[in-house]
């Protein structure tokens, strides 16, 4: 008949059921109370080792098989039993020394179960489920942590960029508004307030010469305590006024003359229209001649 230990070696899932009869047979052979701790320790340690480290099953099963033959052939050799107990203790401590990360699984194995072999056999799936849950929770935590950290690290930079862009836009808008307000509210140049003496001297000079040379303009500016620009602007304004007055006087004289002729009856209404056109043409020609004269004088001043 095949021994249950060989069945355990062949099928790793039946380890707890195969080791339980061995514990009963060892108790039946010895009948002593001091040997009860050894099989219990061996069963619990074997179940833990097989559940956590499947590669060590053969080594532990072979040592256990040799211990079983020692119990059958040498009942009174207590020295061999002590060696077996030391070997079991070394096998029990080796997984803890070699693999610190599996402390959780060994701690779960060390808790004794009162339900018997079926509960021991059902413990590896529970461990697998816990390990799978731990394995599934670890990547999710690892996947979530970098995302949160990236958000926390990037959000201040984005906030600073957005705030900087808003500040720049606000500053540019304020600068544009200030520039527009300055342009719109730019005060006009104050008009030069000439004194009566200055106006008298300028009018006397204009009566003699409508256009000034550069040298004469400089002399007048020095004598009247004015700038050359002020003298130049005054003469320009005075010429424009004189042209308007002259044109108005000529037109008024022509109209008075026409009215006198009409009253006398020497001119017909058709002739009046022709005379009016002629007078207008004469006034236009005189204005054009004055403008050309102004341009000639300005060119002469430029050459000077």
Curated annotation (Swiss-Prot):
InterPro entries referenced in this protein's UniProt entry, alphabetically: HD, HD_metazoa, Homeobox_CS, Homeodomain-like_sf, MOX-1/MOX-2
Feature: DNA-binding region: 187-246
Disulphide bridges, residue numbers: none
Outcome of substituting residue 236 to E: Abolishes DNA-binding. Does not affect ability to activate expression of CDKN2A
Induction annotation: Expression is repressed by ZEB2.
Biased composition (Basic and acidic residues): 158-171, 183-192
Organism domain of life: Eukaryota
Composition-biased stretches (Low complexity): 112-137
Residue numbers spanned by region Disordered: 63-192
Subcellular locations according to the entry: Nucleus; Nucleus speckle
Gene Ontology CC terms, in alphabetical order: chromatin; cytoplasm; nuclear speck; nucleus
Biased composition range(s): Polar residues: 87-101
UniProt GO BP: angiogenesis; limb development; negative regulation of cell migration involved in sprouting angiogenesis; positive regulation of transcription by RNA polymerase II; regulation of transcription by RNA polymerase II; roof of mouth development; skeletal muscle tissue development; somite development
Keyword presence, Nucleotide-binding: no
Pfam families linked to this entry: Homeodomain
Keywords: Activator, Developmental protein, DNA-binding, Homeobox, Nucleus, Transcription, Transcription regulation
Comment field on protein domains: The polyhistidine repeat may act as a targeting signal to nuclear speckles.
Subunit structure: Interacts with RNF10. Interacts with TCF15.
Free-text function comment from the UniProt entry: Mesodermal transcription factor that plays a key role in somitogenesis and somitogenesis and limb muscle differentiation. Required during limb development for normal appendicular muscle formation and for the normal regulation of myogenic genes. May have a regulatory role when quiescent vascular smooth muscle cells reenter the cell cycle. Also acts as a negative regulator of angiogenesis. Activates expression of CDKN1A and CDKN2A in endothelial cells, acting as a regulator of vascular cell proliferation.
Protein name in the entry: Homeobox protein MOX-2
Species the sequence originates in: Homo sapiens (Human)
UniProt lineage: Eukaryota, Metazoa, Chordata, Craniata, Vertebrata
């Amino acid at each position: 008949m095949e021994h249950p230990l060989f069945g355990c070696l062949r099928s790793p899932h039946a380890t707890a059921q195969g080791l339980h009869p061995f514990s009963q047979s060892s108790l039946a052979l010895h009948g002593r109370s001091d040997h009860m701790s050894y099989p219990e320790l061996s069963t619990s340690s074997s179940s833990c080792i097989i559940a956590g480290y499947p590669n060590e099953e053969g080594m532990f099963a072979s040592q256990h098989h040799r211990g079983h033959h020692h119990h059958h052939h040498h009942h009174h050799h207590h020295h061999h039993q002590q060696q077996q107990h030391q070997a079991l203790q070394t096998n029990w401590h080796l997984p803890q020394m070699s693999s610190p990360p599996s402390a959780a699984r060994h701690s779960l194995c060390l808790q004794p179960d009162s339900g018997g072999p079926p509960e021991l056999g059902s413990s590896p799936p529970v461990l697998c489920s816990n390990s799978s849950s731990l394995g599934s929770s670890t990547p999710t935590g690892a996947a979530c942590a970098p995302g949160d950290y990236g958000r926390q690290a990037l959000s201040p930079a984005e906030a600073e960029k957005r705030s900087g862009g808003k500040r720049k836009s606000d500053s540019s808008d304020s600068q544009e508004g200030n520039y527009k307000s300055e342009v719109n509210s730019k005060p006009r140049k104050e008009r030069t307030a000439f004194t009566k003496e200055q106006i008298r001297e300028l009018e006397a000079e204009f009566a003699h010469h409508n256009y000034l040379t550069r040298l004469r303009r400089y002399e007048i500016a020095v004598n009247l305590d004015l700038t050359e620009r002020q003298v130049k602007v005054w003469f320009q304004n005075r010429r424009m006024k004189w042209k308007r007055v002259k044109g108005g006087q000529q037109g008024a004289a022509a109209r008075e003359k026409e009215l006198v002729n009409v009253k006398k009856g020497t001119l017909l209404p058709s002739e009046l229209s022709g005379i009016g056109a002629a007078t207008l043409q004469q006034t236009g020609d005189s204005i054009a001649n004055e403008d050309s004269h102004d341009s000639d004088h300005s060119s002469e001043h430029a050459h000077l």
